């Protein structure tokens, strides 16, 4: 907001021209709003969307302006000219175009320098503002009335800039470093070009470029997915970039006073902003695909290793979750399951890993598509749906998602398979009695993990493959932590059982026949033996919905967590909360070797690392990784899914080599020997 003197200035634009910075807090808004057509409701995005910052919002055509400007009629324009708006209204008599004309008239009224900043200053005049000087401090904390208070964290106090009416011909690059901006007024200037760096201001909700000399908009305008108002009145714009179809929250597109091509103008006149944005989104051509993700070689000697394995993990975004309400920026074709499943299948075949772990695959898609299609590429599969499928009619159960694990049938023998239902496992624990949080918070979540126990046909090495999907909601950190603890506890139990698993005695029955005929295979090695469960190579893949540094992440990486961890919020989960949580495995994230990826989940409102391939570092080491998505490509793509990335998550792929000798050293028995 304004400083108390309203005189703060920065020099960042147009060769040193000064400007005032301002923002307006909601408590300073008056309620005598100028009459305005009702706004369309905000679009509700995906469940990962963070809370919107509404504490500094104001409407361009109401609020401060209602009390700061004289009343005017739409037919009166400040420059002294008159337009017969009534005649134009008679032609359409449409609320959408009537709103366009009203807002255009208001925009033309606002041509004086810093019009909007001055309006806010006028409105807030006389309002008492709390002193900005901090209270006396002692050792970094505030002391008042004998009460010690933690020093509040600093925050950005202003979120809007008004450069209106300054005669600007260019914008300095430093402007686009103000990524916190929510409102930017650049109206009534002489701008001929809007730099593509505008896409960096992704928090903008209001952008006013009216009364300039613009002839086009950059593709990067589509990155501003939080925009509610985009005002382009009185420019020379003839067409709009298809990337504006990404602006699914846009409520007002001010386009009157531009020589816009007929098809676009007709659409916005008759059906309004939402219809035009939807048209641009659906008609958006398929862009040039990004460069292939680099393959990062971490150990060149592994190329000749006789015992290596590649593992892929991928949350594919279940069909029932891929809706316009969650992914309003994506064209309907992009969200269609028929398109996405083919794109996913092609990606899996292109990578051709030894092991595939998929999350959010529904039962119907597994049985009727992926299992059959991947069988042509030598894969066998194991699938379990989430717990809600139990008791459902068969047809209804087809739509329930779960975890699917595929492995190369010519390379591995399936020794065992298990499912872990976190909620059901928790309530069966002896210490669950009387623990209400287990029933009220954990048991209701039906997320699962699937375990498969494999043996390499040729080398005899054995592997435990875990495919997990944890609960998503950040408000349930305790649930994610307990799900992780139960996961590690169950893996520990199964690994000890697998350490005693008998060897395969007749591998001849598993000889692999190539399509073109019988292939001569080397004699298979005997099954490896392991002294304990933590000596068996372990890969734990999935969507853990937990960022690096979270409690769930630290439990896996560090082997344990203290009792009564803060993330539990003093909730009671039996011994897991009373005693603490431990596991015996020495696990590392495969991508930890390069400091993790920039993200594994990418949407306009959420970009973070949620997916991992964990491995037991005492048994295998990482030799290669699939790298980042091209950063230049991401400058014009606000979120996934899109035509090239069929899920809001990206695939992870890592290659490993088994370390040294495996398990027990079995001495050969040559029978009685002569001295």
UniProtKB/Swiss-Prot annotation:
As for subcellular location, the record says: Cytoplasm; Nucleus
- Give the top-rank taxon of the lineage listed in the UniProt record for this protein: Eukaryota
Q: Which SUPFAM superfamilies match?
A: DNase I-like, L domain-like
Q: Which UniProt keywords apply?
A: Cytoplasm, Exonuclease, Hydrolase, Leucine-rich repeat, Magnesium, Metal-binding, Nuclease, Nucleus, Repeat, RNA-binding, Transcription, Transcription regulation
Q: Which Gene3D superfamilies match?
A: Endonuclease/exonuclease/phosphatase, Ribonuclease Inhibitor
**Alphabetized InterPro entries for the sequence:** CCR4/nocturin_mRNA_transcr, Endo/exonu/phosph_ase_sf, Endo/exonuclease/phosphatase, Leu-rich_rpt, Leu-rich_rpt_4, Leu-rich_rpt_typical-subtyp, LRR_dom_sf
Q: What class of enzyme is it?
A: hydrolase
Here the segments flagged for biased composition (Polar residues) are 58-82
Which residue ranges run through the membrane?
none
Molecular function (Gene Ontology), one example: poly(A)-specific ribonuclease activity
The prosthetic group or cofactor this protein requires is: Mg(2+)
Basic residues bias locations: 33-47
So what does this one do? Acts as a catalytic component of the CCR4-NOT core complex, which in the nucleus seems to be a general transcription factor, and in the cytoplasm the major mRNA deadenylase involved in mRNA turnover. Ccr4 has 3'-5' RNase activity with a strong preference for polyadenylated substrates and also low exonuclease activity towards single-stranded DNA.
Instruction: Provide the family line.
Output: Belongs to the CCR4/nocturin family.
Q: What is this protein called?
A: CCR4-Not complex 3'-5'-exoribonuclease subunit Ccr4
Q: Which organism is it from?
A: Emericella nidulans (strain FGSC A4 / ATCC 38163 / CBS 112.46 / NRRL 194 / M139)
Gene designation per UniProt: ccr4
């Amino acid at each position: 907001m304004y400083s108390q003197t309203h005189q703060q200035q920065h020099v960042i634009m147009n060769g040193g021209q000064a400007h005032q910075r301002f923002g307006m807090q909601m408590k300073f808004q008056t309620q005598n709003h100028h009459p305005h057509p009702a706004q369309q409701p905000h679009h509700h995005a995906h469940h990962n969307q963070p809370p919107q910052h509404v504490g500094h919002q104001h409407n361009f055509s109401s609020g401060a302006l209602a009390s700061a400007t004289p009343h005017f009629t739409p037919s009166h324009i400040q420059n002294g000219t008159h337009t017969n708006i009534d005649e134009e209204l008679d032609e359409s008599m449409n609320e959408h175009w009537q709103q366009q004309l009203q807002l255009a008239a208001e925009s033309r009224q606002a041509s004086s320098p810093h019009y909007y900043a001055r309006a806010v200053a006028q409105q807030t005049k006389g309002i008492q503002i709390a002193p900005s000087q901090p209270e006396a401090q002692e050792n970094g904390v505030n002391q008042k009335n004998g009460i010690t208070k933690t020093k509040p964290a600093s925050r950005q106090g202003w979120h809007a800039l008004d450069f209106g009416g300054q005669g600007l011909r260019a914008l300095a690059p430093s402007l686009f470093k103000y990524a916190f901006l929510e409102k930017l007024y650049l109206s009534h200037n002489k701008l001929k070009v809007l730099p593509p760096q505008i896409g960096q201001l992704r928090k903008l909700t209001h952008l006013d470029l009216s009364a300039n000399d613009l002839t086009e908009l950059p593709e990067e305008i589509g990155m501003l997915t939080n925009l509610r108002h985009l005002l382009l009145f009185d420019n020379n714009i003839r067409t709009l970039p298809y990337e504006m179809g990404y602006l699914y929250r846009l409520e007002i597109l001010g386009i009157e006073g531009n020589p816009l091509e007929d098809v676009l103008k007709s659409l916005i006149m008759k059906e309004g902003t939402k219809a035009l944005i939807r048209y641009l989104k659906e008609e958006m051509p398929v862009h040039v695909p990004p460069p292939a993700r680099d393959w990062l070689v971490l150990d060149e000697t592994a190329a000749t290793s006789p015992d290596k394995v590649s593992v892929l993990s991928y949350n594919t975004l279940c069909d029932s979750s891929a809706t316009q309400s969650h992914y309003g920026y994506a064209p309907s074709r992009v969200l269609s399951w028929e398109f996405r499943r083919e794109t996913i299948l092609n990606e899996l075949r292109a990578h051709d890993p030894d092991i595939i772990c998929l999350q959010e695959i529904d039962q119907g898609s597994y049985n009727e598509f992926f299992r059959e299609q991947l069988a042509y590429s030598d894969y066998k599969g194991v699938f379990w749906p989430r717990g809600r499928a139990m008791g459902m009619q068969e047809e209804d159960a087809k739509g329930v998602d779960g975890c699917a694990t595929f492995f190369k049938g010519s390379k591995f023998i399936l020794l065992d398979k298990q499912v872990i239902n976190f909620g059901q496992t928790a309530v069966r624990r002896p210490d669950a009695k009387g623990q209400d949080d287990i029933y009220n918070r954990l048991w209701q979540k039906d997320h699962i993990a699937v375990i498969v126990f494999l043996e390499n046909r040729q080398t005899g090495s054995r592997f435990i493959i875990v495919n997990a999907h944890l609960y998503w909601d950040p408000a349930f950190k305790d649930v994610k932590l307990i799900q992780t603890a139960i996961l590690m506890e169950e893996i520990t139990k199964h690994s000890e059982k697998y350490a005693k698993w008998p060897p395969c005695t007749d591998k001849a029955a598993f000889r692999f026949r190539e399509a073109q005929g019988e292939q001569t295979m080397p004699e298979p090695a005997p099954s490896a033996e392991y002294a304990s469960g933590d000596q068996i190579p372990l890969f734990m893949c999935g969507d853990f919905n937990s960022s690096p540094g979270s409690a769930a992440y630290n439990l896996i990486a560090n082997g344990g967590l203290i009792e009564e961890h803060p993330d539990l919020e003093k909730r009671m989960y039996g011994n897991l909360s009373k005693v603490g949580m431990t596991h015996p495995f020495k696990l590392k994230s495969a991508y930890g070797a390069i400091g993790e990826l920039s993200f594994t989940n990418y949407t306009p409102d959420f970009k973070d690392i949620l997916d991992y391939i964990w491995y037991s570092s005492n048994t295998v080491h990482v030799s290669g990784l699939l790298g980042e998505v091209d950063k230049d490509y991401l400058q014009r793509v606000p979120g996934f899914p899109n035509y090239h990335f069929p899920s809001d998550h990206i695939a992870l792929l890592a290659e490993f080599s088994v370390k040294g000798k495996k398990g027990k050293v079995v001495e050969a028995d040559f029978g009685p020997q002569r001295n």
